[in-house]
From Swiss-Prot:
Enzyme Commission no: 2.7.4.22
GO molecular-function terms, A-Z: ATP binding; UMP kinase activity
Secretion signal, residue range per the UniProt entry: none
Highest rank taxon of the organism: Bacteria
Organism the protein comes from: Cupriavidus pinatubonensis (strain JMP 134 / LMG 1197)
Presence of the UniProt keyword Transmembrane helix in the record: no
Residues holding UMP: G52, D72, T133, G134, N135, P136, F137, F138, T139, T140
Protein name (record): Uridylate kinase
Keyword Kinase: yes
Summary of subunit composition and partner proteins: Homohexamer.
Pfam families named in the record: AA_kinase
Binding site for ATP: K10, L11, S12, G13, G53, R57, T160, Y166, D169
Catalytic activity: UMP + ATP = UDP + ADP
Length: 236
């Protein structure tokens, strides 16, 4: 029995790279889509916000010295490419995915319209939110917090390469331990970088919990949705 009815899944662009230097690793994206398919079959409504670091990192050298707003718009376009790749992989897995973009690109994707997004979720479609918030200076983490609040998600699932929030960097400190649960205020006071400050504040103010878990760990997403001990829960 799922612990949540509607979730917002935040995928980083870097997670799509797999072991590649940049770009989209087909096997990796197919694995993610299979994980998403499993929770859709449980009756969970799934919305996705995707980053663009895997593509933008490939051109980041050329962005040195670039105006921040211009670089951010390039990043938004990178998320659009990832969203289309994710939608295509879903089609092959017989899941209906719909991309809604915060930037208008009408020949390619639908614009973001909140009531339509909610209706599509209720119809069992996976809604993929592209182009972040549509504004520069805001991260895709902030977009995840914003869209999660807008669609009435019960939780933001932040998929990373680490299986939760630790007392210290587990790669540098072998004695670091994983938090099972932690409050927003504790995470702030201990300077734990769960999300960027804007996204974190938005989730805290809206009382929207965050679950940090590993997307590369087999079956982790399903265990999170079933309410099992997986990852770290950040709550009010």
């Amino acid at each position: 029995m799922p612990a949540y009815k509607r979730v917002l899944l935040k995928l980083s662009g870097e997670a799509l790279m797999g072991d590649d230097a940049f770009g989209i690793n087909r096997a990796t994206i197919e694995g993610m889509v299979n994980d998403i398919a499993e929770i859709v079959k449980l009756g969970v409504q799934v919305a996705v916000v995707i980053g663009g670091g895997n593509i933008f990192r490939g051109v980041a050298g050329g962005a040195a010295g670039m105006d921040r707003a211009t670089a951010d718009y390039m990043g938004m376009l990178a998320t659009m490419m990832n969203a289309l790749a994710l939608q295509d992989a879903m089609r092959h897995a017989n899941i209906e995915g719909r991309v809604q973009s915060a930037l208008r690109m009408d020949q390619v994707v639908e614009p973001y319209i909140r009531p339509r997004a909610i209706r599509q979720l209720e119809e069992g479609k996976v809604v993929i939110f592209a182009a972040g918030t549509g504004n520069p200076f805001f991260t895709t983490d902030t977009a995840a917090a914003l869209r999660g609040a807008e669609i009435g998600a019960e939780i933001v699932l932040k998929a990373t390469k680490v299986d939760g929030v630790y007392t210290a960097d587990p790669k540098k400190d072998p004695s670091a331990t994983r938090y099972t649960t932690i409050t927003f205020d504790e995470a702030i006071s201990r300077n734990l970088q769960v999300m960027d400050a804007t996204a974190f504040a938005l989730c805290r103010d809206q009382k929207l919990p965050i679950k940090v878990f590993s997307i590369v760990k087999p079956g982790a997403l399903k265990r999170v949705v079933l309410g099992e001990d997986e990852g770290t829960l950040v709550h009010v």
